[in-house]
Amino acid sequence: MIVDLEGGGVERFLKSFPNHKIIATNGCFDILHAGHVAYLETAKEQGDILIVGLNDDDSIKELKGSDRPINCLEDRARVLASLRCVDLVVIFHEKRAHEFIKAVQPDIYVK
């Protein structure tokens, strides 16, 4: 499942999982590779629900330069959401994940 941080989808999703241990992480995940997958699987092992915050294209350009991202937001989100270990992908629009973390209020934040 993919939601935008600004659309209220995080709150609706979390209401479906009371009493579950929520794990959160975030990143650009521009060219997803085996190391990313292992990292996400390890994060998921820490709890019940893994929520991944995903930087939008504009924030990646600010962080990494005008030639990034290589893959567009929609493709990056879809690939992440297809992973068995990922329960929710949340697109956020800032360079840093502060608002994402505040919205999710995870039991554990993995970075």
Annotate the PLM regions.
Residues M1-K111:
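Nucleotidyltransferase catalytic core that binds NTPs
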